[in-house]
From Swiss-Prot:
This is tRNA dimethylallyltransferase. Its EC number is 2.5.1.75. The keyword Ubl conjugation does not apply. The record marks 108, 130 as: Interaction with substrate tRNA. Substrate binds at residues 19-24. Keywords: ATP-binding, Magnesium, Nucleotide-binding, Transferase, tRNA processing. Its cofactor is Mg(2+). Disulfide bonds: none annotated. Monomer.
Length: 324
């Protein structure tokens, strides 16, 4: 084998798509054909005890094919894009060493971007500083901290809502630890990183030719979650003293709305409508991310044979037949 062939990157198929686009069906179809292991690209599936609202793969589905990065942390904890990148690169190597094929599947596009493009050199979390900022917010309110951020990093503040506690806290934390605005750090060239250079990530994107059809699916899916006991799931989480709406886990679509309903802040119908609307907004953002990937292979997720089309696209990628 020539040196050029030896150094050719290993192709990794990535099945990406918005909520309710059929990713699970396509991944399981591939698992019926090849010895794959699925690496979840989903920031909600990492949390334990959050099964219904995140549409986590069922026990039967997980028994049919190994899944990774699911149920790995407690809802009181956080999981970063940096952690995802490190874990995924490690898992890809471990899966290949077992003689299986890794398939990345999910819809958290920020994770995918971190994996394929690397990370900016931002300081890590500082628990003591976060506690200090939380205390300031408890006293003055998050809009006051948003105003503080606007004075030192107006570009970041301009894209954040005054009550976006998690992101305001992180932006202030970065500024205070680094001495630079987060917007400036994000705009700086990424540090050289060879960790992912051994791989060629090829995205197969499940996108709707008619968004209204996907919106109808989203409503049906949310109703199915409610019927499956989603409110009870959130109630169990709500009874925990260490969980609150400011945590990343409780920012997952649907959980905040169900929590507000249980608090008596909104009625059941409003909770349902807000949950569906939030899911549609997530879907819109996911599609925007996908369409910014010129290298993606597009499959119409509302076509009658969408699973077969996705399966064919994935197999072509893995067989080296997809255009480079």
């Amino acid at each position: 084998m020539s040196v050029s062939l030896q150094s050719r990157p290993t192709t990794i198929a990535c099945l990406l798509g918005p909520t309710a686009s059929g990713k699970t069906a396509a991944a399981l179809a591939l698992a019926a054909r090849r010895p794959i292991e699925i690496v979840s690209v989903d920031s909600a599936l990492v949390y334990r005890d959050m099964d219904i609202g995140t549409a986590k793969p069922t026990r039967d589905e997980r028994a049919r094919v190994p899944h990774h990065l699911i149920d790995i942390i407690d809802p009181a904890d956080s999981y970063s894009a940096a952690s995802f990148r490190a874990d995924t690169l490690r898992l890809i190597g471990e899966i290949a060493a077992r003689g299986n094929t890794p398939l990345l599947a999910g819809g958290t596009m920020l994770y995918y971007k971190a994996l394929t493009q690397g990370l900016n050199d931002l300081p890590g979390a500082d628990p003591a500083l976060r506690a200090e900022l939380d205390a300031d917010a408890a006293r003055d309110g998050w809009p006051a901290l948003h105003a503080r951020l606007a004075r030192i990093d107006p570009a970041t503040a301009a894209r954040l809502a005054p009550n976006d506690a998690q992101r305001i806290q992180r932006a202030l934390e970065v500024c205070m630890l680094s001495g630079q605005p987060m917007s400036a750090l994000l705009a700086a060239p990424r540090a050289a990183d060879d960790a992912a250079a051994a791989y060629r990530f090829v995205p197969v994107a499940l996108e709707p030719s008619d968004r209204a059809v996907l919106h109808a699916r989203i409503a049906q899916r949310f109703d199915a979650m409610l019927e499956a006991g989603f409110i009870d799931e959130v109630e169990r989480l709500r009874r925990r003293e260490d969980l609150h709406l400011g945590l990343p886990s409780m920012r997952c679509v649907g959980y905040r709305q169900a929590w507000e309903y249980l608090d008596g802040a909104i009625d059941y119908r409003t909770m349902r409508d807000k949950g569906i609307f939030a899911t549609r907004q997530l879907c819109k953002r996911q599609i925007t991310w996908l369409r910014a990937m010129p290298e993606r292979i597009v499959v119409d997720c509302i076509a009658r044979d969408s699973t077969a089309q996705a399966l064919d696209a994935l197999e072509r990628v893995l067989d080296g037949l997809a255009a480079r």
